[in-house]
Amino acid sequence: MGSSDVSSRECSLVYNEDPDFTDGTTPCDRLGVDLMNVLDDKDEIKQESVPVSDREIEDTESDASAVSSFASANELIAEPHAASETNLGTNGQDGRNVLEQQRDVVARLIEENKETQKEGDKVCIVPKVWYDKFFDPDVTDPEDIGPINTRMICRDFENFVLEDYNRCPYLSIAEPVFNFLSEIYGMTSGSYPVVTNLVINQTTGELETEYNKWFFRLHYLTEKQDGRKRRHGQDDSIMYLSMSALNLVRDLVEKSMNLFFEKADHLDVNAVDFKIWFVSEGSDIATDSNVSTFLNSSYEITPLQFLELPIKKLLIPDMFENRLDKITSNPSDLVIEIKPIEGNHHWPSNYFAYNKLEPASGTTGLVNLGNTCYMNSALQCLVHIPQLRDYFLYDGYEDEINEENPLGYHGYVARAFSDLVQKLFQNRMSIMQRNAAFPPSMFKSTIGHFNSMFSGYMQQDSQEFLAFLLDSLHEDLNRIIKKEYTEKPSLSPGDDVNDWNVVKKLADDTWEMHLKRNCSVITDLFVGMYKSTLYCPECQNVSITFDPYNDVTLPLPVDTVWDKTIKIFPMNSPPLLLEVELSKSSTYMDLKNYVGKMSGLDPNTLFGCEIFSNQIYVNYESTESNAQFLTLQELIKPADDVIFYELPVTNDNEVIVPVLNTRIEKGYKNAMLFGVPFFITLKEDELNNPGAIRMKLQNRFVHLSGGYIPFPEPVGNRTDFADAFPLLVEKYPDVEFEQYKDILQYTSIKVTDKDKSFFSIKILSVEKEQQFASNNRTGPNFWTPISQLNLDKATDIDDKLEDVVKDIYNYSSLVDCAEGVLMQVDDEGDTEGSEAKNFSKPFQSGDDEENKETVTNNENVNNTNDRDEDMELTDDVEEDASTEPELTDKPEALDKIKDSLTSTPFAILSMNDIIVCEWSELGSNEAFSDDKIYNWENPATLPNKELENAKLERSNAKERTITLDDCLQLFSKPEILGLTDSWYCPTCKEHRQATKQIQLWNTPDILLIHLKRFESQRSFSDKIDATVNFPITDLDLSRYVVYKDDPRGLIYDLYAVDNHYGGLGGGHYTAYVKNFADNKWYYFDDSRVTETAPENSIAGSAYLLFYIRRHKDGNGLGSSKLQEIIQKSRHGYDERIKKIYDEQMKLYEFNKTDEEEDVSDDMIECNEDVQAPEYSNRSLEVGHIETQDCNDEDDNDDGERTNSGRRKLRLLKKVYKNNSGLGSSSTSEISEGCPENEVADLNLKNGVTLESPE
């Protein structure tokens, strides 16, 4: 048959028509195991051996036929063309002919195999893409086909785990075909033959490839569990094995026991008996989440879990020769149990024939997984609430899981919490360590998955964790499947807020609206309502609203004030000191308003700055500062020097100009900053008036210096300029001085030399990037220069003045010069006419050089005479004289003056300039001497009676302890809202600093009180460690609850306290909890649990208080719906436990040993009510028998019973020792002593039976 007769498609379909394969399911899928993920977790895939059936299918005739009919690849190719003597190694043969020959051989082998194939024949699985390429007519060169790569279709060769078919399609070919192709093309590195069998489809009766082998999980039934440390380095990972449906039960037993003893290599195979239980997958497993969970996750299972398995078959020797598909139709779980040969022991599967389930003690600790104490302490407080515990312990929550809630977590959080509760409180076997700590790893993993805050191992806040957990449980268990849209009820305009019925109706409507969207066990137990009242200070409008809560955050009435001494620089009085105390949460605006209130100044005229190194360091009005959002404690440090400047501004045309002070100290050439910077305000027309600028500065210095400096008085508003300023009129005869009257009014006619020794004015221009701009506010632009300015760039104010203005501003210098000339003339005895002539033009330059010399000589004489008396003063005068403009009466000079007057005036100050007042050392010392009562270095203290009274009150209250009542009173105390959280009044249509009061309208059954020990304001946090005295019992909330007619009562008892030790940087959480199982108090410190007294919880570490309502009507906690759920689920739980005991007794009758056969019925009856003392747990070995205590008649003198009748199960030993047939008198006896129909009638659970071999 040629290659054209058999297409690729025909060949591929021969072994690919498999219903089990095409339905898309695998044994892993049916067991609910994602084996792909399991395999991904392996360090490496085992590929050491070719995976075939564990036991060769015993079909010797078929194997012999296959072997005898198989020849080498070259022989098979050469047979149809013997004359050509074809050899694949010959390079001369054309590639196309070689490939066609190969295809012919493969097609012939396939056709021959069709005629002889039968069940059990081996087939090999290859990638479909390779197979199609081999038969592709377009491929003519064998080199293009390449080796067979089975790694792409098989993930685990040992366990026969194939890749997803949709991802990597594959098909099967007969083993001879695969051998032929692999001999020619070989296999890629790491690839192995993927061998399986042909099986008969039980439905269609046709042969098909066994793509899906039987898949088993292996479990170990043991009594020694519950989180104990595993000896010999064992882990709890499940073992998997795969078998062909054609394999025998013997093969399954051998492979299972080999894997088991390979894992449990510490056991001596000759020292133990064993049994293997076959657990089929039934519908119960799919519906029983508990069974499904431990089957999917645990290698070791407990006797209790074993009894809950739905279908159990004991594998006995009579089954060993049966094929697997004859005893089950689905892949299953295998459970192995062992029993030591020596000593008196019983099978773990018979555990409950001798032991009762013991109720949990309620004192199980939680292992710290790494900074998880915040979680452990909160969980201990939560799980010890009886109603919440029972709701999850008895699985009452299952019917209320809301997986459709978009705000929830599809029930994962609820299930994780339930699993935790059951691990802590479920009835347990006595063999288990009663108080062994439990690691809440799965719970933490679930919580961390849905909230990244709790995913790592950083310390977190216990209250934040608790709030998230309660909210998650609420949404996962919300009974409202579809939340309808609701609007929050509110009072109508005209409703009387003083009418109790109106207010109560609003509260009832709000609660009803809340329950339309929120109804769960959390709502039943933890949720109450606040009443919030807002009073508008302007229109007296009152707003009342109600809001739900699940915890009450109480402030602590402790000294948490921020205190600081602030300087105030009023405009028209000396500097002041004001001691301030405000709340640590206060803002800069609160401080500003407080300073204005206590000083009597308008807060809108106050500008705050921090001063450092004689200059402005921080401008609190600037948008670049943090004053807009930081608290005072974060904004202003204790060492900061804070000054509030009063700058009254009447209109937008006024400009605020910063002023710095410098002086040249002895031994220095350059001026250095000193004193305190300040500000002056100038009107727009004063910016070019040097006299006005100087007058403003002098007025400020008078107040800043304590009123000492005797600055000369200006002439004021005068019109007789010729009489007041004769020298100016004489120097500028053509100038109309009326236009300079605004400048002339600030000029002094006569000054002394001491005047110029105080300060000179310089102007320093600052770039915009060197400014701190003000915040967006009305009025002038308030700005401050940045620090580290280059003061050497400051220019003298004279350099910015035109000649006439300069002479007006420096008129005192003209007077000084004129007086100096007259004095010199008098000394030389000139004639009267000459004197008059010279005086009339004292600075006439003309052609008379003698006058210049006279003036010069006169100045030198004065300088010489004055130097001894006051050298510093002389230097200043000399410097000023040198800057005087030269007076002239030349026509060109007058023209120049006229031109300057008609030109645009030159601005002295611009918006980016600052004033630098340069003082002489002598002048600064004289003006700001230490003998002043008040000055800028020693401000006057402003009395603060309000602060003094507050300090006195705190001093008297130091000995008084803080109580929970104090906290509750402070909680309901009305407070005035700040500027940053003002309320929008609907009547005023404005944001108002309203008065707000929050009160408890009602309280829930579980009252969670959060003591606000942590104060966090953005970047700053602090902790309050003060002790709050809270009652252990009889907390009466009737004084603090508005709705006092609650029929449930308002008396509460403490049952738990969550503690925090340490500070914000690091700490530790613990819990005091009342255990309702024994009504004792315990201290839970992660895994350590000790008995304690509740009074020990009253300490500065108490953080969260849990109170439970004492119902006066006798009803239970929570809603009637919750009580009904708990009662029903508890009844179901009790029935389940009873069923377990019943099942155990049935199993015991089937499973008991020879020794147990001899135990009297009285001993078994003795165990129905109490654990029989003869089956005590003197060690961790259960089943040690001392019969004399239960039945004295059965005493033996030697105290030990012989083992003459023990029959042992020796299956595995025979395999290990001599590889002979498996058999055991013990298990065989079970089959012999229990007829087949009786075995089938042993109901264990839900009508499922133990089955005997067919």
Curated annotation (Swiss-Prot):
Catalytic activity of the protein: Thiol-dependent hydrolysis of ester, thioester, amide, peptide and isopeptide bonds formed by the C-terminal Gly of ubiquitin (a 76-residue protein attached to proteins as an intracellular targeting signal)
Regions of compositional bias (Acidic residues) in chain numbering: 867-883, 1189-1198
E.C. number: 3.4.19.12
GO biological process: DNA damage response; negative regulation of mitochondrial fusion; protein deubiquitination; proteolysis
Record bears the keyword Phosphoprotein: yes
Keywords linked to the UniProt accession: Hydrolase, Phosphoprotein, Protease, Thiol protease, Ubl conjugation pathway
Domain of life: Eukaryota
Misc note: Present with 7110 molecules/cell in log phase SD medium.
PANTHER family, sorted: UBIQUITIN CARBOXYL-TERMINAL HYDROLASE
Protein name: Ubiquitin carboxyl-terminal hydrolase 12
Species, as recorded: Saccharomyces cerevisiae (strain ATCC 204508 / S288c) (Baker's yeast)
Lineage of the species this protein comes from: Eukaryota, Fungi, Dikarya, Ascomycota, Saccharomycotina
